[in-house]
Amino acid sequence: MARKSNKTAMAFAMQAQTDVFVIPSASLDLYPVSNLNFSIAGITVENPEYTGSIHKNGPDVVGKTISGSFNINMRPPGGDDVPVANAYIPGRVLKAAKFTETIVSAPIPAAAEAIGGAGNTTTAVTLGATAGTAVDLYKGMALLLPTIIGPARDKITAIRSYSAAKLAALMETLDLAASGTYQIPKQVSYQRSISESDAPLLSVSQWLDGMRYDLVNFRISGLRWVMPVSTRDGATTPTFEVTYTATINSYGDEATPAIPAKGATPSFKDGKLFVAGKAVGGSNLTVDFGLRTAYAPDPNYADGSGAGELVESTTTINMDRQAYLKAQFYTLAMAEGQAYYPVYAQWGYTGGKLVQVVVPDARFNYQSPTLGQDFITETGDMYVDVFDRNVCINFPYFLA
């Protein structure tokens, strides 16, 4: 019988040591993926030898390269409580792309406390007596402000920056100045790291209808977060788009394991999209991390190169956004001034099933108006410079 594409599965394990394959569990380490592409490409060298005729021998096959791509739905961990370290399997992919996993396993403080008495506006709030004083201690994290008007999910916001005076700048503009109490809710966060340490490798088992490939030194070579807005005219799921390179450790015939259902993925709607402190409309938001991978020459390896290493990353935001009047939202002036502006997206309804994308500081490139459809839109890039936690994704847990 013909082999079937839908009988495809991937299992992911963190790899502690280069070249040492860690066997992923065919049950515990599985996670559903889509749009898998898997390439085994030969490395060839032309044979220059004369043959005594007009005909030449074919190239010598001297090795192979393994690469591919796949998508993972931007599905939060779910459940009633934050997962333990390394339990959220898409988080392993994020860690392999140079993100740090941060788990807040208990609210800070344990009970909501009064906010500070000074500096509270629609864009900033002073945290209370028990809050820490280290600069940027809570940068990029979710924050619960119960006095925000609306359902429980709307009371969740995020912190753009944090000062030693406990002033938390917000990623959005509130309708009213912050008052009452605050709390940093339980959450699992993945924060972009600019440390000098190398991103970890993965070991991956990949099944293609009855055949398993074990991939060692699995290196994330490209990562995009694609967040289309779901509308009354059509819905599309937000995804992590991943490309990779690897080495085949082994392969053989083995039945594809069944992947447990993970539930629906929240759509990007009925949430928040703030750019430069303004709620804006649009159809798509994409964060491209611009990863570049290289391979050091090494004759100790079968293909003459060592394991892939991340050597460069340039982060760019692209969005298709409604165009506004100069008095409302003037991107031309913002591009000319080259100041930093926050970009913030949030969607989902309940604790454990809500997504926050937090970019504290980004610069505008010039944006182009687009006509021809029903509405005038603007498209263009924003650039994210090298700051620690310059991009974060949070999955907060809170009571509805």
What are these regions (language model features)?
Residues M1-A400:
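Signature of extracytoplasmic/envelope-associated structural regions
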